[in-house]
């Protein structure tokens, strides 16, 4: 009988500790959810502006046959597109970014081959694909073009 009473006391204490731990854990979960809800998340336009910069830098790198820099800029564009798909899932536009893949692959192929003529034509294809994507998501007023001047004066593209 003493063993039975000891077991009841033991389980009673253990259950109370478990309930106390559950309350503490729930409080921590609630706190983390609140912090997460107020964490900064870049907007779709910020991602697009980032791509615009790398698109321009890609052009000047390729025009100057700086294939290493062009390759770097391609990776930056790809990373930003991946971030759009990860952080902007609620946006309808996010579902369309994969339409850029064939033109990105064409530019990448030109870079790997170090072929200026192929780079020029594939870059134009990429630019037109950007505009087609903009039209597909009702942002056709946002027209991308081949840049005329480098986006930054403090970077060498040669």
Task: Map each language-model feature to its residues.
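Sec-dependent signal peptide recognition
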Residues: 1-7
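Immediate post-signal-peptide N-terminus of mature secreted/exported proteins
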Residues: 19-67, 158
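Short, solvent-exposed, charged loop/turn and helix-capping segments
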Residues: 80-97
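The canonical Cys-X-X-Cys-His
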Residues: 126-137
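Short cysteine/histidine-rich metal-coordination sites, predominantly Zn2+-binding motifs
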Residues: 144-154
